[in-house]
Amino acid sequence: MSKRGRGGSSGAKFRISLGLPVGAVINCADNTGAKNLYIISVKGIKGRLNRLPSAGVGDMVMATVKKGKPELRKKVHPAVVIRQRKSYRRKDGVFLYFEDNAGVIVNNKGEMKGSAITGPVAKECADLWPRIASNAGSIA
């Protein structure tokens, strides 16, 4: 898969359960000053009539900051989902889920705006986004 289509990511993405529809509020797990992120769209979703676009681990979304620093609020930021509460199946057959939904703010190339991530990052996300993997404290 070409780097151009995935916005600075590497490798192929496997299908996982999508647990975050448009309108979901997720935690912001980096040190940019944002507390939460409100998902307004999902990158790469074509969609079907009346179906809400949904995101899963490793997906890039467009989000706004609802709580956090005033300079981050009232703007649209690209973000990547790093954890989701909805269980998803890995290729080895194990089902995995996290205790919260979380994302990190990135730029259009997939480089993080912050410099640290709180909590674990899903392996699926770390494989797709090398800049996020390098800032992750732990990869689960």
UniProtKB/Swiss-Prot annotation:
GO molecular function terms noted in the UniProt entry: large ribosomal subunit rRNA binding; structural constituent of ribosome
Broad class of the protein's primary localization: cytoplasm
GO CC terms: cytosolic large ribosomal subunit
Gene3D superfamilies, alphabetized: Ribosomal protein L14
Keywords: Cytoplasm, Ribonucleoprotein, Ribosomal protein
Pfam family, one: Ribosomal_L14
Described purpose of this protein according to its UniProt entry: Component of the large ribosomal subunit. The ribosome is a large ribonucleoprotein complex responsible for the synthesis of proteins in the cell.
Protein name as catalogued: Large ribosomal subunit protein uL14
Organism, as annotated: Danio rerio
